[in-house]
């Protein structure tokens, strides 16, 4: 008769890969178009002016300028203030 001994239970489980989430460009930093500003799960920060949002909720710059964080109506918005053209 074939037997299979029971597998032991895991105590600590597996170690998952790091996700590297968070703010990548802080307020006052200069960014170029396409620069990632925030990596997040869900909308912790919302896109403001000159900021786009990817399907994984990543916020990125649409224009060259300076990052600005602001609160409006209980939400945190991230905007990029364009550089003055000379």
Curated annotation (Swiss-Prot):
**Residue numbers spanned by region Disordered:** 1-21
Gene Ontology cellular component terms for the protein in this record: cytosolic large ribosomal subunit
Q: Name one GO biological process term.
A: translation
**Entries under PROSITE patterns matching the protein:** RIBOSOMAL_L27
Which SUPFAM superfamilies does the UniProt record give? Answer: Ribosomal L27 protein-like
One GO MF term: structural constituent of ribosome
> Keywords on this record?
Ribonucleoprotein, Ribosomal protein
Spell out the Gene3D superfamilies in the cross-references. Answer: 2.40.50.100
Superkingdom in the source lineage: Bacteria
Question: What family does the Swiss-Prot or TrEMBL record give for this protein?
Answer: Belongs to the bacterial ribosomal protein bL27 family.
Among PANTHER family, the record links this protein to: LARGE RIBOSOMAL SUBUNIT PROTEIN BL27M, RIBOSOMAL PROTEIN L27
Name recorded for this polypeptide: Large ribosomal subunit protein bL27
User: To which species is this protein native?
Assistant: Coprothermobacter proteolyticus (strain ATCC 35245 / DSM 5265 / OCM 4 / BT)
Its encoding gene is what? rpmA
